[in-house]
């Protein structure tokens, strides 16, 4: 059994290439349509990870469609949801998703609740935001796969101290292992069939 199977049915993903600042600014309608289509295709997931790029910084958003909730996990510390370029676009896309009968909390209708999720804070001046995003994503998914009721309803979060070098090395090793064993086959081709929602 492949290692990724423990996450199957639990987590989904939006394509980070579709959520970069440049594309949001230049192709907002296409990005919104992509988000609606991807949410509908993955509405049975417990959560959907969105790695979004804000200028030269990466942050993680975790969408819980059934709760109308988005958690922002940012290694820069607390960031108001309004500072993310995707917020307005995502709110509109979620409304369209609800209109198309996507899974959501009927008590909130089209409203999206944005919440901050405490995260490890990267050292000032470091260029490790991508590794922090991956660490938070892997840790979140690991905990979610073990105890679905623990996140995010309870008081949950990460410590705010910087990651230790061995923790960053572990993230890199896990990612390399994932790509070499789950994504790329022996011939160097991608194993994932039909992975696009475009």
Can you say where each PLM-predicted feature lies in the sequence?
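A structural/positional concept
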Residues: 1-5
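Cysteine protease-like catalytic core of ubiquitin/ubiquitin-like
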Residues: 7-198
């Amino acid at each position: 059994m492949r290692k990724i199977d423990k996450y199957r049915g639990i987590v989904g993903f939006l394509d980070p290439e579709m959520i970069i600042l440049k594309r949001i600014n230049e192709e907002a309608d296409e990005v919104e349509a992509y988000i609606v289509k991807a949410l509908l295709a993955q509405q049975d997931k417990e959560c959907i990870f969105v790695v979004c790029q804000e200028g030269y910084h990466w942050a993680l958003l975790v969408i819980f469609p059934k709760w109308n909730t988005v958690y922002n996990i940012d290694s820069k510390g607390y960031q108001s949801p309004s500072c993310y370029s995707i917020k307005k676009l995502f709110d509109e896309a979620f409304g369209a998703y609800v209109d198309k009968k996507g899974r959501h909390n009927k008590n909130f209708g089209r409203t999206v609740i944005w919440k901050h999720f405490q995260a490890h804070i990267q050292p000032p001046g470091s260029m490790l935001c991508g590794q922090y995003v991956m660490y938070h994503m892997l840790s979140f998914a690991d905990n979610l796969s073990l105890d679905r009721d623990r996140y995010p309803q309870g008081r949950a979060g990460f410590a705010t101290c910087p990651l230790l070098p061995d923790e960053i090395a572990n993230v890199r090793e896990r990612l390399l292992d994932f790509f070499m064993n789950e994504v790329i086959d022996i011939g160097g081709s991608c194993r994932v069939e039909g992975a696009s929602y475009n």
